[in-house]
Structures are given as C-alpha cells and as structure tokens.
Amino acid sequence: MTEYKKVIAQNKKALFNYFIEERLEAGIVLKGSEVQSLRQGKASIEESHATDTGHEVFLYNCHIAEYEKANRFNHATRRPRKLLLHTKEIKKIIGRIRIKGYTLVALSMYFNKKNKVKVELGIAKGKKLHDKRESIQEKDWKRDQSRLIRQK
C-alpha cells in the first residue's frame, strides 16, 4: 500500500550537495498562520538544516511565507521551528551529527494522510567537487542511455 504524501516543498539541491546516509521523518511545531500558508504551498526549504540544542532538535532557515489573511497575528518567516522526535531518535541524531562532516538536512516537507505537516530529514555527509562532477556525469550517461534506447 502506498503512503499518501502531499508534497509542499523539496530540497533537490541537498541530493546534489550531500550523500544521504539515512532518512527519517519528524513532526514540526507550527503556528496556525504557518499551516495556512503551507496549504497554499508557500514554503521553501532550499537552505534549511537542523541542529540540536541540548535535548531538542530545531529546523533553521526554513522559509514559510506570511499568510496574507492573518493580519496582525502573522509569524516570522524564517524563525527556528522545533522538530518533534522520540528521545531515542534525538540521541541517535545527536550522536551522528557530532561526527565531523555530518549534518542534518531537510529533504522535503509534506502533509501525511492525517493532514499533519511532516519533514523528511537526512543525515548527510558533504560531497567534494569531484563527487559532484561524478554525479553530473552519471546523470548525463543515464540520459544518453535512454535516448539510445528510444532511437532503436
């Protein structure tokens, strides 16, 4: 059975800049105007990342546009947002991202089947320039292969 996901925002750049070693799902604490703005699809997680502050994990640099109809009760667009994770998951994440070179990157934001906003996180290690070139060459080669197959 396929899981229902209404994708709000994706971070395609993260897949290019990082090796994603592990993926996990987290809830996120939002205000009402933020949820309404997300329903309209006005969000960007291009440069967002998560870090730990003691025993909690926060998502930074995630842009959720202001909701136009929430006049004076609007939210700050790039405020840090708390991620909802189990204690075991938090300890595991903290242990992994304390290792040099690892970071916690937001990969996508979506509504699940219960209409809750979820964030897909990835424990990632940064790619070097030559790794990025390899991934570009690999992508080009796959594109050329599909062209050759279509021509036959």
From Swiss-Prot:
Xref: PROSITE patterns: SSRP (PS01317)
Keywords: Cytoplasm, RNA-binding
Subcellular location: Cytoplasm
Pfam families in UniProt: SmpB
InterPro entries with a match to the protein in the record: SmpB, SsrA-bd_prot, SsrA-bd_prot_CS
GO CC terms, sorted: cytosol
Location (main, coarse): cytoplasm
Domain of life of the organism encoding this protein: Bacteria
Gene Ontology molecular function: RNA binding
HAMAP family: SmpB
PANTHER family listed in its UniProt record: SSRA-BINDING PROTEIN, TMRNA-BINDING COMPONENT OF TRANS-TRANSLATION TAGGING COMPLEX
UniProt-recorded name of the protein: SsrA-binding protein
